[in-house]
């Protein structure tokens, strides 16, 4: 069994491409979830990054801390990368990390001239504890204690779940959230062991796909509008463009759809409830065997015998799968034709992969002395890597840049942070002022004096940034 890395980030923004990690917490644990090692670090805010006020308030990160921390962002990232390398092949786990922390990590590594997909390649895997927690309570009710919201649904917020489950929790600190996630995993492993074991089979997308294809029928759950919804499904085909497994919901009678003309089928597949579902194999689906159908009333009424018959009908009908593939391909092509053709910024191009030769020489940039790094950048064929390298020099050793390079980078930053165009994707000074005004009114009404005090500190900090960039 492999070890696990539980990790969490606090960030300057909710934007994974334009924000910055400002605090890292990570714990290495063995297969029994005993702690073996840990990494904890904070850093300064990099030039050109304008923080979102609410992000700082949630993580209780003061402007003073952002300005005076010894480590730069690049230095913190380098230390974290070296620690991860020393931990070797592991399964990464966070809390809602597949929709947040993982994406932040990938973009951070990409923009710091590191291979971005380290958590899911070279023998590494990645799962998500929030998926585990929802599945554990679905298959083994009461595994975890949750607060119920006004709509009567269970909440899966780490800061409320931890104390309810007897976990001491320094909420919204990277290490505090890390420790809480680890403790929740221990509860699941103990009280819902079959869910825990099943989750280990789908933390790798290739293994997940294999399970989906090989199981005649299986149970999964999805999260919609605050509710965990269960399904019993069987594999139909992979999406011909996006490669996601498409599955048939077995509460529907497949005989209705198997021999439909393709144009009729196309219309039927758009109706709700969906006959055809997407089982995102790269998002750590928790896949359970059909013995659990008694947990789901709709499927229990149909019965395992009938569900198995339906699965056999779907899986044997190759023409149905071919028609579905044609429909999906047409839809994808239509979508591509209407997709915006606007140019992407370098920061938004993580999935445009650099040449293999460039990936091989990435480590040399970090190994080179600072006064050698600029020359080293010329080895990269990919202009984006040269751009990111110059940005790192601007942030760390601006005096080593030529006046032309410095003026170009600094001028771009000034335009970005001062723009009043609210459609821009990065955070700006005017946008943060507007956010502060909104929060000031909100916290004033709720009489949250500590948050109001911190808000004023953030406002002063943003004024300092505005003064600096306005006189650049």
How should each PLM-predicted stretch be described?
Residues 44-59, 63-67, 124-178:
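Active-site-proximal helix-loop-helix substrate-binding element of RNase H-like nuclease domains
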């Amino acid at each position: 069994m492999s070890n696990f890395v539980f990790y969490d980030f606090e960030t300057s923004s909710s934007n994974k491409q334009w924000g910055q990690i400002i605090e890292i917490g990570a714990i290495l644990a063995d297969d029994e979830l005993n702690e073996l090692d840990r990494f904890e670090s904070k850093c300064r805010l990099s030039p050109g990054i304008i923080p979102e006020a609410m992000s700082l308030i949630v993580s209780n990160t003061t402007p003073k801390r952002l300005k005076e921390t010894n480590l730069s962002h690049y230095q913190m990232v380098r230390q974290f990368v070296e620690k991860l390398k020393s931990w070797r092949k592991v399964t990464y786990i966070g809390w809602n990390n597949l929709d947040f922390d993982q994406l932040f990590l990938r973009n951070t590594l990409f923009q710091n001239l590191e291979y971005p997909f380290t958590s899911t390649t070279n023998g590494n895997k990645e799962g998500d504890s929030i998926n585990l927690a929802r599945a554990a309570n679905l298959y083994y009710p009461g595994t975890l204690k949750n607060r119920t919201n006004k709509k009567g649904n269970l909440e899966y917020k780490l800061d409320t779940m931890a104390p309810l489950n007897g976990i001491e929790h320094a909420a919204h600190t990277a290490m505090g959230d890390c420790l809480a996630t680890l403790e929740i995993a221990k509860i699941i492993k103990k009280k819902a062991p079959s869910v825990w074991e099943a989750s280990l089979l789908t933390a790798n997308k290739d293994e997940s796909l294999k399970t989906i294809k090989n199981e005649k029928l299986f149970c999964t759950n999805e999260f919609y509008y605050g509710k965990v919804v269960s399904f019993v499904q069987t594999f139909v085909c992979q999406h011909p463009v996006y490669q996601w497994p498409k599955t048939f919901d077995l509460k529907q009678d497949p005989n209705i759809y198997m021999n439909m003309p393709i144009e009729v089928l196309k219309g039927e597949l758009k109706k709700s409830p969906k006959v055809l579902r997407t089982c995102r194999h790269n998002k750590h689906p928790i896949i359970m065997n059909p013995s659990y159908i008694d947990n789901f009333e709709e499927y229990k009424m149909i019965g395992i015998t009938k569900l198995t018959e339906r699965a056999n009908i779907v899986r044997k009908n190759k023409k149905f799968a071919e028609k579905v593939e044609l429909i999906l391909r047409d839809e994808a092509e239509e979508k591509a034709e209407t997709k915006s053709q606007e140019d992407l910024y370098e920061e938004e191009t993580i999935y445009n992969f650099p040449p293999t030769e460039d990936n091989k020489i990435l480590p040399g940039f970090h190994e080179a002395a600072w006064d050698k790094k600029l020359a080293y950048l010329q080895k990269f064929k990919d202009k984006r890597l040269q751009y990111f390298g110059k940005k790192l020099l601007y942030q760390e050793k601006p005096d080593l840049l030529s006046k032309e390079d410095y003026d170009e980078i600094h001028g771009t930053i000034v335009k970005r942070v001062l723009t009043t165009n609210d459609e821009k994707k990065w955070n700006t000074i005017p946008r943060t002022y507007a956010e502060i005004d909104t929060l000031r009114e909100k916290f004033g009404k709720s009489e949250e004096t500590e948050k109001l005090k911190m808000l004023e500190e953030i406002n002063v900090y943003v004024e300092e940034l505005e003064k600096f960039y306005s006189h650049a």
